[in-house]
Structure formats: structure tokens, C-alpha cells
UniProtKB/Swiss-Prot annotation:
Enzyme Commission no: 5.4.99.25
GO BP, sorted A to Z: mRNA pseudouridine synthesis; tRNA pseudouridine synthesis
Isomerase is among the record's keywords: yes
GO molecular function, one term: tRNA pseudouridine(55) synthase activity
Keyword tRNA processing among record annotations: yes
Pfam families: TruB_C_2, TruB_N
Enzyme class of the recorded protein, top EC level: isomerase
Substrates-to-products reaction catalysed: uridine(55) in tRNA = pseudouridine(55) in tRNA
Annotated NCBIfam families: TruB
Function of the molecule: Responsible for synthesis of pseudouridine from uracil-55 in the psi GC loop of transfer RNAs.
Originating gene: truB
PANTHER family: PSEUDOURIDYLATE SYNTHASE TRUB1 (PTHR13767:SF2), TRNA-PSEUDOURIDINE SYNTHASE (PTHR13767)
Name of the protein this chain belongs to: tRNA pseudouridine synthase B
Length: 312
């Protein structure tokens, strides 16, 4: 069964998209590889039926985004949901200053998640506590920001580019390209347009907050488009309306792991959960005649099955 990258529209939760896929595909076995906030759009990777076994191997995939960071105002959710809770007058930073601040966030770091997030502490969801007027002490999480590229600075959100085309560098402002739908702005704030490549677990809302703090002003994420998840680009994604007939991608295309071809006895042993002897070291995808057999971990002596797939 396929892996289907979907272009999530503005306003839907990731669970909304999963439910629509279940109805469209006629199956309850649908999962996704990483939540996208309701006010964000872009790539949400769905795994259908037997492909749901892949989710655990895809959740750590790196992601790319276009992010609009509004300077001079913030909100409890750190995005355009509002309401504004702090507003200060601010002028746009220079390109030199903005680039220097962004460069300071590239690399491994500890990031504090937003209060409005699904993180659990002591059995409590952070967003549930926040909606009730409270706040949890959220521990910082280790993340990696691979790259942050400043694509533009605007005096206000309405002047920031919204039309983009894919290039060799990623999605780039292009008046002949595709126009993205973004949330209504909370105000007329100077806005940074940033292209970001980050590890799994990175909150772009937290990044917006922290970039603002580095510039000495409150800030929030005014818009977000996820343009890539692992191997899947926004250009490869289907609309929610086209889920029923979407062909998607085969399971093998989803796994960015070294591959090893098995003969029939080895394939059978792995599918039975056995631990055959092997000099292979590290995690590998095992195939047989182009079919996915298993994901295994090798210690140089034997193979341990992490996940196996039944033969055709």
C-alpha cells in the first residue's frame, strides 16, 4: 500500500486529514509521520494500510519550511491564532543584522517547545493546561537546525512574497509560481521570510519566538508552509480532494536506509522473526526481488528484525 504526501490546507488539523484519508481510502489504517499545525499548510506524509509500519522509521525525517516571522507582537500560541498579548513599535532590522541573528540558530541546540503543543508532562497535555489558563514547565528538547536562509524583509506581512516556485535551492519567491494561502495577519508587523531546514521535533513557532528575542522584540510565526518531509516535496503532494485516487509512492521509496538483497531462505527467516547470522553492521532495509522484506539491525554477528513485511 502507498505512502501519500498530502498538501494540507489551511485550517485543517493533521487528524482531520487522516480522517478524510480513512474515508477516501476505505480503511482505518492511516497514520502520518509528523503533525502540522492547523494554521500551517504543506506536506503531511500519510501511510496507508501496511505502510503504517513505516511511520516509526520516517518520524525522524528532516523537514523544510517557508516561515514568515512577524516582529513586534506575540500571542499565546506563538502564531497567527491570536490574540496579541504584547505589542511594541519596531522597525525592520537590516539584512546584515537579520542574517547574523539567523546564523546564530544554525546547528544543534536545546529548544523550549510552545505552551500550546501536544507535549505531555506528568500525564498532562501542555495545550490543555494552557487553554485552562495554566502553564507547564516544559523541558528543552535537543534539535538541529540545518540551515536558515533569509529570503526577504518586509515592512508588513501583506508586502511579503506569497508566490513561489521550486528551484535547485528549494522553494523560492517567483511571481510565475504557486501562491500559498496564509493566515490573516494579526497586525502590520515587519516580517522576515525565512527558508528553514530542520530536524524532526523542531517547533518553528518556538524559533520565531527565539529569533524575536535575539532581536530584542516579541515575535510570532505569521505563516508557515512545509515544503519537504524527507524525500517528499510539496510538488509531489496531492490535494485532500484527490486522496481517493492517489497512487502515492511505494514503501521502498520511503526508507532512506542502506539496502541489502536477500535470497529466499534469508527472506523467509527474517519474516519469521529469526536472527540469521550476518556480518552486516547497522540498520538496513532488506529486499527480495524488489519487495520489502524487513528493516533489520546488524551487530556484525547476526541480524535482528525491527519490522518485517509479509511476502506477496
Amino acid at each position: 500500500m502507498p505512502v501519500i504526501p498530502v498538501d494540507k490546507p489551511l485550517g485543517l488539523t493533521s487528524h482531520d486529514v487522516v480522517n478524510r484519508a480513512r474515508r477516501a481510502r476505505g480503511t482505518r489504517r492511516v497514520g502520518h509521520t509528523g503533525t502540522l499545525d492547523p494554521l500551517a499548510t504543506g506536506v503531511l506524509v500519510l501511510c496507508v494500510d501496511d505502510s503504517t509500519k513505516l511511520v516509526q522509521f520516517m518520524e525522524a525525517d528532516s523537514k523544510e519550511y517557508l516561515a514568515w516571522i512577524a516582529l513586534g507582537g506575540t500571542s499565546p500560541t506563538l502564531d497567527a491564532e491570536g490574540p496579541l498579548t504584547e505589542v511594541v513599535p519596531v522597525s525592520p532590522p537590516s539584512e546584515e543584522e537579520a542574517r547574523a541573528v539567523l546564523a546564530g540558530f544554525v546547528g544543534p541546540q536545546a529548544q523550549v517547545p510552545p505552551q500550546y503543543s501536544a507535549i505531555q508532562v506528568g500525564g498532562q497535555r501542555a495545550y490543555a493546561v494552557a487553554r485552562a489558563g495554566g502553564a507547564l514547565d516544559l523541558p528543552a528538547r535537543n534539535i538541529v537546525i540545518h540551515a536558515l536562509e533569509l529570503l526577504g524583509i518586509s515592512n508588513r506581512m501583506a508586502e511579503s512574497p506569497r508566490t513561489f516556485a521550486r528551484s535547485s535551492e528549494g522553494w523560492t519567491p517567483d511571481p510565475t509560481g504557486r501562491t500559498f494561502t496564509l493566515p490573516e495577519p494579526l497586525g502590520e508587523f515587519p516580517t522576515l521570510l525565512v527558508r528553514a531546514s530542520v530536524s524532526s521535533g523542531t517547533y518553528l513557532r518556538s524559533l520565531a519566538r527565539d529569533v524575536g528575542a535575539a532581536l530584542g522584540v516579541p515575535a510570532h510565526l505569521a505563516g508557515l508552509v512545509r515544503t519537504r518531509v524527507g524525500r517528499y516535496d510539496l510538488a509531489d503532494s496531492v490535494s485532500v480532494e484527490d486522496l481517493a485516487g492517489a497512487e502515492g509512492f511505494p514503501n521502498l521509496a520511503a526508507l532512506d536506509l542502506p539496502r541489502m538483497e536477500a535470497d529466499e531462505p534469508l527472506a523467509r527467516a527474517l519474516r519469521q522473526g529469526k536472527r540469521p547470522r550476518s556480518a552486516v553492521v547497522g540498520r538496513h532495509v532488506v529486499t527480495r526481488d524488489g519487495e520489502l522484506v524487513a528493516v533489520v539491525d546488524g551487530d556484525g554477528k547476526e541480524l535482528r528484525v525491527v519490522r518485517a513485511w509479509a511476502g506477496a
